[in-house]
Design a protein with these regions (language model features):
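Pocket-edge structural micro-motifs
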Residues: 1, 15, 24, 78, ...
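Contiguous, structured surface segment used for ligand recognition
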Residues: 1-69
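Short glycine-enriched loop/turn motifs at secondary-structure junctions
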Residues: 15-17, 220, 316
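Short helix/loop capping segments that flank catalytic or ligand/cofactor-binding pockets
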Residues: 30-33, 84-86, 191, 332-333, ...
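Short, solvent-exposed amphipathic alpha-helical segments in soluble enzyme
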Residues: 37-39, 91, 360
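Substrate-binding cleft of carbohydrate-active enzyme catalytic domains
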Residues: 69-303
Length: 382
């Protein structure tokens, strides 16, 4: 590493007839230089088989390169569909090749809990497995009718329990440590997400005292959330994150905070008492109270919090980072950066990889303007 101008990840690469020299302003910069060197070779270098008859020459170059954005990430949702450790590592390899340095690991959601929490074993014993839902059945249908093996659900992710066919899986804490070590070598930080207070059906269905009422399920739009009025629920959430934080040696944790069904909060005596005791006027403010309480817990353990852009509603703390995903909420980035909060652009209209080309064109992605309606000072927070 050496004195290379530019944001973290900048590097120089010089290739001459007898040597190659790579200098980065950080470990990530050196990795980026190595990946550029890798791309200079003939494409056969990516073959997993032995290749013969290829001239392994590279052009003589002098490259000075630096990223426009220090945060270049991708999110993998392992709840809706579970991915094995080997599959996660394969994604990390691709990320490194394309100089992406932040792996956002969406570890939990309504459809499955994917990380071992030793204090709460039912989260993975029961919460990691589900009966086939409509999306699963559609994947199976397409795998057969379209003869598309990529859509098939692998047999090693299926088990039979009391006559029921269940789909899922989870990572042990040793698995997590293995992935962390693998990512570190490739210059990739991991941002773990345990989504709350919504998207917690896999948790609230298996432990009492976490939701507002014993009956859990789906409201008018989203699933039953955590009850922010119960101290037992707050303790549950903090105990989970305490184990998570002990595993991941990074600056950030992601709390989620999106798509919260607040119907139960309006009729829950514990929630209404919490609102009264803290002079909260709306359920949106109650959600912010919960988010801020969790953020103070994170800060006390040396971590900073990221949340989906819903955390702006009801009041945003000065220290949180906002991940803007709702492309229809066009002023989210403007509001957050106006008060000095960093914003990570993840607009679904451009960046959701499960959208078909007719809905999310390459031109739309390429032409996204991350500086629109922002002052230079605000632009520096993107």
């Amino acid at each position: 590493m050496g004195d290379v101008q530019g944001k973290e990840g900048a590097y120089t690469l010089t290739a001459e007839s007898d040597k190659v020299n790579i200098t980065g302003n950080s470990y990530g910069g050196v990795i980026a230089g190595i990946e550029s060197l890798r791309q200079l070779f003939p494409p056969q270098i990516e073959s997993k088989e032995i290749v013969k008859g290829t001239d392994w020459a590279i052009p003589a170059v002098n490259i000075q390169d630096a990223p426009r954005f220090e945060w270049r990430g991708i999110m993998l949702d392992v709840s809706r569909h579970f991915y094995t450790i080997d599959e996660v590592k394969e994604l990390l390899d691709v990320m490194a090749l394309y100089k992406m340095n932040k792996f956002h690991w969406h570890l939990t959601d309504d459809q499955g809990w994917r990380i071992e929490i030793k204090k709460y074993p039912l989260l993975t014993e029961k919460g990691a497995w589900r009966k086939f839902n409509s999306h699963d059945r559609e994947c199976i249908r397409q795998s057969k009718t379209d003869n598309n093996p990529d859509m098939a659900i692998p047999e090693d992710k299926i088990r039979i329990v009391e006559g029921d066919t269940l789909y899922g899986g989870y990572y042990t804490q040793e698995d997590i440590k293995d992935v962390i070590a693998y990512a570190k070598i490739r210059g990739i930080d991991i941002i773990p997400e345990i989504d709350m207070p919504g998207h917690m059906l896999a948790a609230v269905s298996n432990y009492e005292g976490v939701s507002c009422f014993n009956e859990t399920g789906w409201g008018s739009v989203f699933s039953s959330p955590v009850c922010p009025g119960k101290d037992s629920a707050l303790e549950f959430c903090k105990n989970i994150y305490a184990e998570l934080i002990a595993l991941f040696p990074y600056k950030y944790v992601h709390i989620g905070g999106d798509e919260v069904e607040k119907t139960n909060w309006k009729k829950c005596p514990d929630c209404q008492k919490r609102m009264h005791d803290n002079n909260l006027k709306t359920e949106e403010e109650l959600q912010s109270w919960f988010i801020h309480d969790m953020e103070r817990f994170f800060n006390g353990k040396g971590k900073e919090m990221i949340g989906w852009d819903e955390i702006i509603e009801g009041g945003l703390s000065k220290t949180a980072t906002v991940m803007w995903w709702r492309s229809w909420v066009k002023d989210a980035a403007t509001k957050a950066t106006a008060q000095g909060n960093p914003v990570i652009f993840t607009p679904n209209g451009q960046f959701y990889l499960d959208y078909a080309e007719d809905k999310n064109s390459m031109a739309s992605i390429y032409n996204l303007d991350t500086t629109d309606n922002l002052t230079p000072e605000q632009q520096s927070l993107i």
